[in-house]
Amino acid sequence: IGPRPGDSYPADPVWCAHLGARVPLLEVLCAGARPLIFVDTLCQDSASAQPMIDEFRRCAVAAGISPDAVTGSTEDNVVTTQTGIGVTIIGVIPDGDLPKALDGDIVVCVGAPISAPDDDVTPDRPEIVTLDEVRALMASGKVHDCVPVGSHGVAWEAEQLSSTAGLRIESQHTDVNLTRSGGPSTCLVLACASGNVEELCGLVAPERPWAVIGHLSSVV
Protein backbone atom coordinates (compact mmCIF):
# COMPACT_ATOMS: atom_id res chain seq x y z
CA ILE A 1 0.00 0.00 0.00
CA GLY A 2 1.58 3.29 -1.09
CA PRO A 3 2.82 5.34 -4.07
CA ARG A 4 5.83 3.23 -5.12
CA PRO A 5 6.06 1.14 -8.33
CA GLY A 6 5.73 -2.21 -6.56
CA ASP A 7 2.74 -1.25 -4.42
CA SER A 8 -0.46 -3.10 -5.36
CA TYR A 9 -2.80 -0.50 -3.81
CA PRO A 10 -2.05 3.20 -4.51
CA ALA A 11 -2.13 5.58 -1.55
CA ASP A 12 -0.65 8.88 -0.40
CA PRO A 13 2.64 8.25 1.47
CA VAL A 14 1.91 10.76 4.24
CA TRP A 15 -1.49 9.20 4.90
CA CYS A 16 0.13 5.75 4.87
CA ALA A 17 2.54 6.96 7.53
CA HIS A 18 -0.31 8.41 9.58
CA LEU A 19 -2.30 5.19 9.53
CA GLY A 20 0.81 3.13 10.22
CA ALA A 21 1.48 5.26 13.29
CA ARG A 22 -2.03 5.62 14.67
CA VAL A 23 -2.71 1.91 15.20
CA PRO A 24 0.13 1.21 17.68
CA LEU A 25 -0.28 4.66 19.25
CA LEU A 26 -3.95 3.96 19.94
CA GLU A 27 -3.10 0.57 21.43
CA VAL A 28 -0.73 2.23 23.90
CA LEU A 29 -3.03 5.16 24.72
CA CYS A 30 -6.08 2.94 25.22
CA ALA A 31 -4.08 0.74 27.59
CA GLY A 32 -3.80 3.76 29.87
CA ALA A 33 -0.10 4.14 29.15
CA ARG A 34 1.94 7.25 28.44
CA PRO A 35 3.84 6.79 25.16
CA LEU A 36 7.48 7.84 25.46
CA ILE A 37 9.42 6.68 22.39
CA PHE A 38 8.45 6.29 18.73
CA VAL A 39 10.60 4.01 16.53
CA ASP A 40 9.98 3.71 12.79
CA THR A 41 11.57 1.36 10.26
CA LEU A 42 11.07 2.24 6.60
CA CYS A 43 11.94 0.09 3.58
CA GLN A 44 13.02 2.95 1.32
CA ASP A 45 15.71 5.60 0.99
CA SER A 46 15.83 8.49 3.41
CA ALA A 47 15.10 11.18 0.81
CA SER A 48 11.82 9.68 -0.38
CA ALA A 49 10.90 8.69 3.18
CA GLN A 50 11.26 12.20 4.63
CA PRO A 51 7.58 13.21 4.21
CA MET A 52 6.60 10.04 6.06
CA ILE A 53 9.11 10.72 8.83
CA ASP A 54 7.69 14.24 9.20
CA GLU A 55 4.21 12.75 9.60
CA PHE A 56 5.50 10.32 12.21
CA ARG A 57 6.74 13.30 14.21
CA ARG A 58 3.35 15.00 13.91
CA CYS A 59 1.60 11.85 15.12
CA ALA A 60 4.07 11.49 17.98
CA VAL A 61 3.38 15.03 19.17
CA ALA A 62 -0.39 14.45 18.90
CA ALA A 63 0.04 11.41 21.16
CA GLY A 64 2.14 13.32 23.70
CA ILE A 65 5.59 12.15 22.58
CA SER A 66 8.41 14.66 22.18
CA PRO A 67 9.55 14.99 18.54
CA ASP A 68 13.08 14.39 19.84
CA ALA A 69 11.94 10.92 20.96
CA VAL A 70 11.17 9.86 17.38
CA THR A 71 13.89 7.66 15.92
CA GLY A 72 14.22 5.00 13.26
CA SER A 73 15.94 3.83 10.11
CA THR A 74 15.60 3.77 6.33
CA GLU A 75 16.95 1.48 3.61
CA ASP A 76 19.76 3.29 1.81
CA ASN A 77 21.94 0.32 0.86
CA VAL A 78 19.80 -1.33 -1.81
CA VAL A 79 17.08 -0.17 -4.20
CA THR A 80 13.53 -1.04 -3.10
CA THR A 81 10.28 -0.70 -5.04
CA GLN A 82 7.58 -1.18 -2.41
CA THR A 83 6.42 0.78 0.62
CA GLY A 84 7.17 -0.95 3.91
CA ILE A 85 6.43 0.58 7.32
CA GLY A 86 7.19 -0.70 10.80
CA VAL A 87 6.34 1.25 13.96
CA THR A 88 7.19 0.43 17.58
CA ILE A 89 5.87 2.50 20.49
CA ILE A 90 7.38 2.27 23.97
CA GLY A 91 5.27 3.57 26.83
CA VAL A 92 4.79 3.31 30.57
CA ILE A 93 1.71 2.80 32.72
CA PRO A 94 2.12 5.20 35.68
CA ASP A 95 0.38 3.08 38.32
CA GLY A 96 1.32 -0.25 36.77
CA ASP A 97 -2.27 -1.44 36.36
CA LEU A 98 -4.11 -1.97 33.11
CA PRO A 99 -7.58 -0.39 32.93
CA LYS A 100 -10.59 -2.61 33.61
CA ALA A 101 -14.30 -2.12 33.01
CA LEU A 102 -16.78 -2.26 35.90
CA ASP A 103 -20.09 -3.99 36.46
CA GLY A 104 -22.88 -1.72 35.18
CA ASP A 105 -20.67 0.23 32.77
CA ILE A 106 -22.10 1.53 29.52
CA VAL A 107 -20.28 0.38 26.36
CA VAL A 108 -19.86 2.99 23.63
CA CYS A 109 -18.52 2.87 20.08
CA VAL A 110 -16.69 6.11 19.26
CA GLY A 111 -16.22 6.67 15.54
CA ALA A 112 -17.34 4.05 13.04
CA PRO A 113 -15.63 1.07 11.37
CA ILE A 114 -14.39 1.72 7.84
CA SER A 115 -11.66 -0.06 5.90
CA ALA A 116 -10.09 -0.02 2.44
CA PRO A 117 -10.64 -1.15 -0.25
CA ASP A 118 -14.40 -1.15 0.46
CA ASP A 119 -14.19 2.40 1.86
CA ASP A 120 -12.18 5.44 0.87
CA VAL A 121 -10.25 5.93 4.12
CA THR A 122 -9.24 9.59 3.80
CA PRO A 123 -8.20 12.13 6.47
CA ASP A 124 -11.47 14.07 6.32
CA ARG A 125 -13.75 11.12 7.10
CA PRO A 126 -15.89 11.89 10.19
CA GLU A 127 -15.88 8.21 11.13
CA ILE A 128 -12.21 8.34 12.14
CA VAL A 129 -11.55 9.11 15.81
CA THR A 130 -8.42 11.24 16.22
CA LEU A 131 -5.37 10.80 18.45
CA ASP A 132 -6.18 14.08 20.21
CA GLU A 133 -9.68 12.84 21.03
CA VAL A 134 -8.40 9.55 22.42
CA ARG A 135 -5.90 11.40 24.62
CA ALA A 136 -8.68 13.63 25.93
CA LEU A 137 -10.95 10.67 26.65
CA MET A 138 -8.25 8.77 28.52
CA ALA A 139 -7.06 11.86 30.39
CA SER A 140 -10.59 12.50 31.69
CA GLY A 141 -10.21 9.72 34.25
CA LYS A 142 -13.77 8.62 33.44
CA VAL A 143 -12.99 5.89 30.90
CA HIS A 144 -12.73 2.57 32.75
CA ASP A 145 -11.40 0.66 29.74
CA CYS A 146 -10.93 1.30 26.04
CA VAL A 147 -9.88 -0.78 23.03
CA PRO A 148 -9.22 0.22 19.40
CA VAL A 149 -11.28 -1.68 16.83
CA GLY A 150 -9.32 -3.65 14.23
CA SER A 151 -10.21 -6.20 11.60
CA HIS A 152 -12.28 -8.35 13.99
CA GLY A 153 -14.92 -5.63 14.33
CA VAL A 154 -16.74 -3.80 17.12
CA ALA A 155 -18.58 -6.80 18.60
CA TRP A 156 -15.39 -8.84 18.96
CA GLU A 157 -13.51 -6.01 20.67
CA ALA A 158 -16.45 -5.32 23.00
CA GLU A 159 -16.42 -8.99 23.97
CA GLN A 160 -12.68 -8.79 24.70
CA LEU A 161 -13.23 -5.71 26.87
CA SER A 162 -15.99 -7.40 28.86
CA SER A 163 -14.28 -10.78 29.29
CA THR A 164 -11.06 -9.13 30.49
CA ALA A 165 -13.08 -7.65 33.35
CA GLY A 166 -14.84 -10.95 34.08
CA LEU A 167 -18.12 -9.49 32.85
CA ARG A 168 -20.53 -10.03 29.98
CA ILE A 169 -21.94 -7.51 27.56
CA GLU A 170 -25.69 -7.05 27.18
CA SER A 171 -26.02 -5.70 23.65
CA GLN A 172 -28.68 -3.25 22.55
CA HIS A 173 -29.97 -2.21 19.14
CA THR A 174 -27.57 0.00 17.24
CA ASP A 175 -27.02 1.17 13.69
CA VAL A 176 -23.29 0.47 14.05
CA ASN A 177 -22.08 -2.42 11.89
CA LEU A 178 -20.72 -4.62 14.66
CA THR A 179 -18.88 -7.11 12.45
CA ARG A 180 -17.28 -4.80 9.89
CA SER A 181 -13.51 -4.34 9.95
CA GLY A 182 -12.28 -1.22 11.71
CA GLY A 183 -9.29 -1.10 9.36
CA PRO A 184 -6.60 1.17 10.82
CA SER A 185 -8.54 1.48 14.10
CA THR A 186 -10.93 4.12 12.77
CA CYS A 187 -13.08 3.66 15.87
CA LEU A 188 -12.81 2.39 19.43
CA VAL A 189 -14.94 0.79 22.12
CA LEU A 190 -14.95 2.24 25.63
CA ALA A 191 -16.61 1.47 28.94
CA CYS A 192 -17.70 4.15 31.40
CA ALA A 193 -20.29 4.87 34.07
CA SER A 194 -23.71 5.79 32.73
CA GLY A 195 -23.51 9.21 34.34
CA ASN A 196 -20.38 10.12 32.37
CA VAL A 197 -21.53 9.24 28.85
CA GLU A 198 -22.67 12.75 27.96
CA GLU A 199 -19.55 14.44 29.35
CA LEU A 200 -17.25 12.08 27.46
CA CYS A 201 -19.21 12.61 24.25
CA GLY A 202 -18.38 16.30 24.56
CA LEU A 203 -14.66 15.49 24.29
CA VAL A 204 -14.93 14.41 20.65
CA ALA A 205 -15.93 16.41 17.58
CA PRO A 206 -19.70 16.90 17.11
CA GLU A 207 -19.58 15.08 13.77
CA ARG A 208 -17.88 12.03 15.28
CA PRO A 209 -20.20 8.98 15.48
CA TRP A 210 -21.02 8.11 19.10
CA ALA A 211 -23.25 5.13 19.83
CA VAL A 212 -24.14 3.21 22.97
CA ILE A 213 -23.97 -0.47 22.00
CA GLY A 214 -24.69 -2.15 25.33
CA HIS A 215 -23.89 -2.39 29.02
CA LEU A 216 -21.82 -4.71 31.19
CA SER A 217 -23.10 -7.04 33.87
CA SER A 218 -21.78 -9.78 36.12
CA VAL A 219 -21.45 -13.26 34.68
CA VAL A 220 -24.27 -15.40 36.12
What is each residue range found by the language model?
Residues 1-52, 57-114:
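Glycine-rich phosphate/pyrophosphate-binding loop regions near the starts of catalytic domains
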Residues 27-30, 127-132, 171-172:
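Short hydrophobic/aromatic-rich motifs at helix boundaries and adjacent loops
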Residues 73-74, 132, 175-177:
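A generic local structural motif
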Residues 84-89, 97-140, 144-162:
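Conserved mixed alpha/beta catalytic, RNA-binding, or beta-rich assembly cores of soluble enzyme
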Residues 55-66, 80-81, 139-144, 149-220:
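Glycine-/charge-enriched secondary-structure boundary and capping motifs
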Residues 38-42, 114-119, 178, 185:
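Active-site-proximal beta-alpha loop/turn segments in soluble metabolic enzymes
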Residues 7, 11-22, 46, 50, ...:
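Electropositive phosphate-/nucleotide-binding environments in soluble metabolic enzymes
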